[in-house]
Swiss-Prot record:
The pyrin domain (also called DAPIN domain or PYD) is involved in PYCARD/ASC-binding. The modification Phosphotyrosine is found at residues 13, 134, 138, 166, 860. InterPro entries: DAPIN, DEATH-like_dom_sf, Leu-rich_rpt, LRR_dom_sf, NACHT-assoc, NACHT_NTPase, NLRP_HD2, NLRP_innate_immun_reg. This is NACHT, LRR and PYD domains-containing protein 3. A motif (KFERQ-like motif 3) lies at residues 797-801. Disulfide bonds join 8-106. It comes from Rattus norvegicus (Rat). A motif (KFERQ-like motif 1) lies at residues 353-357. LRR repeats lie at residues 741-761, 770-791, 798-818, 827-848, 855-875, 884-905, 912-932, 941-962, 969-990. It is found in: Cytoplasm, Cytosol; Inflammasome; Cytoplasm, Cytoskeleton, Microtubule organizing center; Golgi apparatus membrane. Residues 1-93 form the Pyrin domain. The modification Phosphoserine is found at residues 5, 159, 199, 263, 293, 332, 727, 734, 805, 1034. Its main location: cytoplasm. Pfam families: FISNA (PF14484), LRR_6 (PF13516), NACHT (PF05729), NLRC4_HD2 (PF17776), NOD2_WH (PF17779), PYRIN (PF02758).
Amino acid sequence: MKMMSVRCKLAQYLEDLEDVDLKKFKMHLEDYPPEKGCVPIPRGQMEKADHLDLATLMIDFNGEEKAWGMAVWIFAAINRRDLWEKAKKDQPEWNDACTSNLSMVCQEDSLEEEWIGLLGYLSRISICKKKKDYCKIYRRHVRSRFYSIKDRNARLGESVDLNRRYTQLQLVKEHPSKQEREHELLTIGRTKMWDRPMSSLKLELLFEPEDEHLEPVHTVVFQGAAGIGKTILARKIMLDWALGKLFKDKFDYLFFIHCREVSLRAPKSLADLIISCWPDPNPPVCKILCKPSRILFLMDGFDELQGAFDEHIEEVCTDWQKAVRGDILLSSLIRKKLLPKASLLITTRPVALEKLQHLLDHPRHVEILGFSEAKRKEYFFKYFSNELQAREAFRLIQENEILFTMCFIPLVCWIVCTGLKQQMETGKSLAQTSKTTTAVYVFFLSSLLQSRGGIEEHLFSAYLPGLCSLAADGIWNQKILFEECDLRKHGLQKTDVSAFLRMNVFQKEVDCERFYSFSHMTFQEFFAAMYYLLEEEEEGVTVRKGPEGCSDLLNRDVKVLLENYGKFEKGYLIFVVRFLFGLVNQERTSYLEKKLSCKISQQVRLELLKWIEVKAKAKKLQRQPSQLELFYCLYEMQEEDFVQSAMGHFPKIEINLSTRMDHVVSSFCIKNCHRVKTLSLGFLHNSPKEEEEEKRGSQPLDQVQCVFPDPHVACSSRLVNCCLTSSFCRGLFSSLSTNQSLTELDLSDNTLGDPGMRVLCEALQHPGCNIQRLWLGRCGLTHQCCFNISSVLSSSQKLVELDLSDNALGDFGVRLLCVGLKHLLCNLQKLWLVSCCLTSACCQDLALVLSSNHSLTRLYIGENALGDSGVQVLCEKMKDPQCNLQKLGLVNSGLTSLCCSALTSVLKTNQNLTHLYLRSNALGDMGLKLLCEGLLHPDCKLQMLELDNCSLTSHSCWDLSTILTHNQSLRKLNLSNNDLGDLCVVTLCEVLKQQGCLLQSLQLGEMYLNCETKRTLEALQEEKPELTVVFEISW
């Protein structure tokens, strides 16, 4: 009889796996340790493979011996000991000479067809080798083309190594919302880095499905604000693929397409496009396109296409050899009319998302959020070759909160670094670095002029009016690419533009020599704002007019600009107006007039003030700008006198804050507002406390409104997860002493820190402060601020509720707090010290508080390593008749049955205790038996007992039944996450049916119960409707 082959044997083992185990096997196979020297199997081939196919793939990729070893290892990993033992005994005898290594021939480029046996595989080896040769040639070309980038201010011939300069960007999978489609530059300080948590995404998983049952992703859209790093990320993807670091087994070819270049070229075919990417004029186009599923087209800058994708354009191209207009060619690829099986990666600004969305079928949207705080630091250290300079520059920017926030945008980070380096090289102080967008751009422009010398500066001043009018014309007409005729229309010549190229004001397109653009959209907005400020001298009289030949919209009347603000499609005017406010700052105006030898209008200041006055008094701002946007404009100016005049017109302020920048901006404006009577602030991600639904009152979670007496201003009571820092809190806390209506303050999830807490404590001790409830969870506090908190506790009788959870106070910090808690004037009723790094050492101090503080009724000290000894110390004082504690939380405190005797003594003697939380402590059946003694005592008044996840088994059934039968006070019992078993639960149901059982709520979540027990529970619920039974069956 012929021996069974290894492949058949392996397939036979895999057939023993149920569907769930087979999925686990594939998952472990995908994550098989690379150090074991095995070749990974492409996910696309593996996910649809059945038992036989999977066995074939494993052997074809790694040979029989390694495949068998992999299977044995994975059987153990998925807890199939039966198969593991059987496979070890049944292991074939290997012949090293016959070990299959054929799969290594095409290791760089995986075969996409199913493997159909060794004979078919051998017949394709020669084809695979040829394909590999073409791939190698093209990869080398891509490496050469993309290994370096040219810095924006680089001299001729200078470039920067992309791998050395590139800093990782934050990528998240999100569906674009209306807010995300607003003008991209408004995302400065508004990204969701400090908002709700998001699912980050790795580049290698871009085209992988979120669920293994779903089809692979074929279209990915990178969206992000201008300057956020879309293009450099696209180039990095090209380089990593060429280096074999990315998509190695997924794509044979990646083609980089500049959307704006393609749309401006003469009609070309897809074949022409590939030829333009190839290192020589004769690429194997037919062979490349014969497998479109192995091709990725990377389209950079969809939003920069000229006139493409209008709704009325229906012309498409389905022939890869047919020459068509560039926009039609790209449209056909995107709409999957041409090469429908090819994959696409498209980068775009948010403003073009709506237009793009209608063309795509099930795309994956990935948002580029820019740099995290850690990556900003990394970027500084990569930009500055000198580590001391990098450290000094980063420290300076980090101290400047608003500018540090703006640096999450890579372009702004580059501008800041460039400006700082320029100052360092000239030996000037870095203290002049400003904190507004306008100041950054003015400083950068100044740096450019200084680096070019006096003659260039004089030329720039002469051509500045034309440059500004060109920018404004482009803004009004939504135009970013200009031809030479556009330059001439605004008094500019081609020779003038070459000077701007050197100064980095303009960027000449590499392959589109007849077209010019500002190097970045924000530069265009900046110069457009200057257009409304510049005055011209004409026969001794100062006039303000637009260049000859420009449209009527280009008159210099700023009223026209402001009237259209908010109405203009896509919000292109938003940043122009912000820059306008920043440029009319008097010091900045004087600086620009001197530096650029120009005359700047003072009339614009009055027009801006009138505009703010009208908007401030409007009953409801149905259109842009919102009040917060007006505040951003005022903040950009940085003139307190002007801001005070403007804010004097606000009778009511209603704004929603979500970022650090929002807080800084609003704080700057609100502190200069002396007439506002009502302030309503909305915040993101407010969440109620787990245990006390009533403690929040009736205020809505998303907005709290406070009315303040003139002339002082305060803030809303709810500031959860708003990235507050001490700079914002000073303005907030100063109002606590005068606002009589503010009684609740929630500062949870803010980087308050000990310095901010000290500022808050000063305000809380003021006689005029009426704060009663204060929540400070996760505020970065340590023992260093506990003395200040203790002083508040000993001086303020108004404070009745304090939450300090998730702060590393430690035992020493609690000892300091206890000094205040024991003070006669302390009136605190509720205290949370959950997860505060406490041990049994602090329990003696807390015990003294329990016996001396008669107001404290609720103490939550769970998630701390108190241990049995610590709780025993607490219990000694809780037996004191003077102890008024009603609720005690000891969740996950490292307790065992050893502390249950002490707890039983408390239950027998303390009739005040009504709630006891013992969740996630290994009390066991013995612990419950000891507690049962106290619960059956006639003096026990406990109403709520939480024993979730306390290691109880069916042996506790008798004690639980006894408690339910005889305890007359217990109303709520949580037994979830315990292994009670079906029989015990059915027994409890019978007890609960009795008339003498007064329990109102029973929780049995996460129990392994059968269907019969489930029906018994449902029947109990119907028979006794006053009893609530919560059960979540785990199978």
